[in-house]
Amino acid sequence: MEPILSAGRANGGADLVKDTDINGFMTDVIEASRQVPVIVDFWAPWCGPCRQLGPALERAVRDAGGAVRMVKINIDENPEIAQQMRIQSIPAVFAFRNGRPVDGFVGAIPE
């Protein structure tokens, strides 16, 4: 996997941090990653490390000023995507670029 640009979020009304589901995955992740890298956060509401990591990722996205977008996927509500991506532990974070995953990690990591 090749390295990805640091996380970022632009202002101006664009949906740069958003939730998606099986119906929006192709547009929100695959197609969007052809324009700008997309960080995908696989999480669940009962996951303590997910609740810690999510806000830290969102801050990093905002701080990078539009370099990337972030999409959050609740694995309890979207088991099909989790299965397709072979998610076995959460939090699991993948960076997509040009329509494919290029980097990722599993578990909460310190800022």
Regions found by a protein language model. Give the residues of each.
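Proteins that catalyze or organize thiol-disulfide redox chemistry
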Residues: 1-66, 79-80, 84-86, 90-92, ...
